[in-house]
């Protein structure tokens, strides 16, 4: 089969039940409004269980007590996760004070969870508090629309505090893309904000009546930082600047990390370069990519429905030509760009506008008052006096942005007293985990609760081999859906069963190579034994500046993944 047209443009066959649900939902209304009044269950029933995802929520339960409740003949302790729409991760201090209050007063866990989708989540919202949370968000100019399910999700943007003008321009585009691709249905406003039903019929000119075949993720990235991990995303706009001013974007399409254990029809994939476009075509191109995936994506198999599979089926050139046709443009050749890193610069950084930016390391993004480390209270105190904004990073950290010289000492004092500036190793700064147990229904192994002590052990190995000043990009994800982005790490652990993980090696520091499975279904002691040996070899045999992942490839420890659609599972 030629690249020109290797497979059918549209997959024929029986549609998945999710397609029926969307079609019958009356533009995402379902019977959610009626279900809210059903006090007999703490959860949502039937289609509503899935429909609430379009409104930014997932129904979960506390898995630590699930078996115990079942023995007592009680339903699981249902509660919702809510994910806010926050393009580019920028949040005002007024908004922060509102979400702090809600988390403390109206959630089971009392925490704010920063996520690597550059936003925050509330975990443990009981059904009676579901409508109030949407109304609270609306009252401060926020919403949770389209942060889950088959839509364009929260749009990421590089958290680059140094080049303030470039960041401001890129951030504006992240917001514009997010707004342009939002669903037009009034269901969200009617159900949560009590807005009147209007007589006009709903229309979805971009997303269509059955929305997208699967989730869709978009980024705006400013080289040389790849902090947003562009290759985990469907559509990526790489900022191209001239004289410090944004002039256009390189477009990369078809990244994604989710796989299914043992299912070789699934694979992680890096995004393909389509070409360069000047700024004025940005929204037309974004819409064209989304509508092409809307029409060509596989609606008969949700495990094969993402953009990465569409590209592999129809061919990159065919998909690209269709985007050009729909947008009415021709891509120019890719402009040069390179990445040098993807971690956050923890601590104070001076921007070109003479303001300072303080990046705080938040382990696993979990903001709570811990004994001796009142992180949540500390951030609230800063929010009360800070005149700039907060920025959530795609590494689950938080930037106190735009601090004038005169305010620096005051903010630093609060941060230090609250444990927000405690010294951590470079290794801990470059490690990340998804939430997993106890709230995630898909979790197979621990991630967030496992990572801190696991990194203690890794730090000990790094010290033993004399490389404590170095780091390895290390990530843990509780299941192969891959929210922890382990499939772009130098060392990635993918949960297989309680206490067991698949160990992936051979990714690189800048996040442009998918790691291959090195060992399957192993325990923490087995993982540490493997890494002890390999870190020891890296410390002795590496070349100048050579990262751990690149070393494992050069030393022949593991073959690199060159074409993941074909060789990931070899």
Swiss-Prot record:
GO terms for cellular component: sulfite reductase complex (NADPH). Keywords: 4Fe-4S, Amino-acid biosynthesis, Cysteine biosynthesis, Heme, Iron, Iron-sulfur, Metal-binding, NADP, Oxidoreductase. PROSITE patterns: NIR_SIR. Its EC number is 1.8.1.2. It is an enzyme of class 1 (oxidoreductase). It catalyses: hydrogen sulfide + 3 NADP(+) + 3 H2O = sulfite + 3 NADPH + 4 H(+). One of its GO terms (molecular function) is metal ion binding. Pathway: Sulfur metabolism; hydrogen sulfide biosynthesis; hydrogen sulfide from sulfite (NADPH route): step 1/1. Component of the sulfite reductase complex that catalyzes the 6-electron reduction of sulfite to sulfide. This is one of several activities required for the biosynthesis of L-cysteine from sulfate. Alpha(8)-beta(8). The alpha component is a flavoprotein, the beta component is a hemoprotein. NCBIfam families: CysI (TIGR02041), PRK13504.1 (NF010029). This is Sulfite reductase [NADPH] hemoprotein beta-component. It comes from Escherichia coli (strain ATCC 8739 / DSM 1576 / NBRC 3972 / NCIMB 8545 / WDCM 00012 / Crooks).
